[in-house]
Amino acid sequence: MADVMERVTKIIVDRLGVEESEVKLESSFKEDLKADSLDVVELVMELEDEFDMEIADEDAEKIATVKDVVDYINNNQ
């Protein structure tokens, strides 16, 4: 899980311009990391590329926290 978390964190830091220390499993994209809906869509696209997977729209809509992303990737790779 650490490798997935590291890769997810790097993408979030690069895309949202937040500090790495702000990215925690419990961090909410919209409330804690100040991402808007377009940011989340772009994050999902980058995550799909990074992990060579497709995240269905209905699944992407359920992603609210960093933990949601990490769990989704771990469960669907």
UniProtKB/Swiss-Prot annotation:
Residue positions where O-(pantetheine 4'-phosphoryl)serine is found in the record: S37
Classification via PROSITE patterns: CARRIER
Modified how: 4'-phosphopantetheine is transferred from CoA to a specific serine of apo-ACP by AcpS. This modification is essential for activity because fatty acids are bound in thioester linkage to the sulfhydryl of the prosthetic group.
Carrier domain mapped to chain residues: 2-77
Gene Ontology MF annotations: acyl binding; acyl carrier activity
Location in or out of the cell: Cytoplasm
GO annotation, cellular component aspect: cytosol; membrane
Keywords: Cytoplasm, Fatty acid biosynthesis, Fatty acid metabolism, Lipid biosynthesis, Lipid metabolism, Phosphopantetheine, Phosphoprotein
Keyword Transport listed: no
Biological process (GO), any one: lipid A biosynthetic process
Pfam families to which the protein is assigned, alphabetical: PP-binding (PF00550)
Keyword Lipid biosynthesis belongs to the record: yes
Pathway(s) of this molecule: Lipid metabolism; fatty acid biosynthesis
HAMAP family: Acyl_carrier
Protein family: Belongs to the acyl carrier protein (ACP) family.
Function summary: Carrier of the growing fatty acid chain in fatty acid biosynthesis.
Protein name: Acyl carrier protein
